Amino acid sequence: MSDKNEKTEKNERLSVFKTYKLYVGGKFPRSESGRVYEVTDAKGKWLANAPQSSRKDARDAVVAARKAFGAWSGATAYNRGQILYRIAEMLEGRRDQYVREVAEAEGLSKSRAAAQVDAAIDRWVWYAGWTDKIAQVVGGGNPVAGPFFNLSSPEPTGVVAVLAPQESSFLGLVSV
């Protein structure tokens, strides 16, 4: 094949559009509605398709989270910290990809996007470090009137829904 034909073939190639799926219970199911919506960057340029979730999808996510709750709340603080630290390691390993995607999605310069990604990674490490310390800081004996003891200890309590803010979505999602 000649160089001219090779260049023409590359230019005529269609790009493959990314359509994301949900992440529920360790799997990537399609939305029950089968619908998607466009995700655009700060300038309105198309980035990807995202699933438009239905009530059933939300219910399935809550059921899966409740199913996983026993294992998560039963894990030691040290183990939970190791899991959070592993998330930070994985983000660090794909830092360049996250910097590129945050810059595209939010219309930021590479340096500002890198600062946001670095702050998000640092925050995961910070959270991981606090998992085995929070009980000593927040929990403990509470003074009460009379011959009683009032002890408190923080424990996981259940399913939480988190929505990322419109501005600074990646760092905002990690910070919530």
Task: Tell where the protein language model's regions lie, with residue ranges.
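Conserved small-residue-rich beta-alpha loop and adjacent elements
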Residues: 137-176
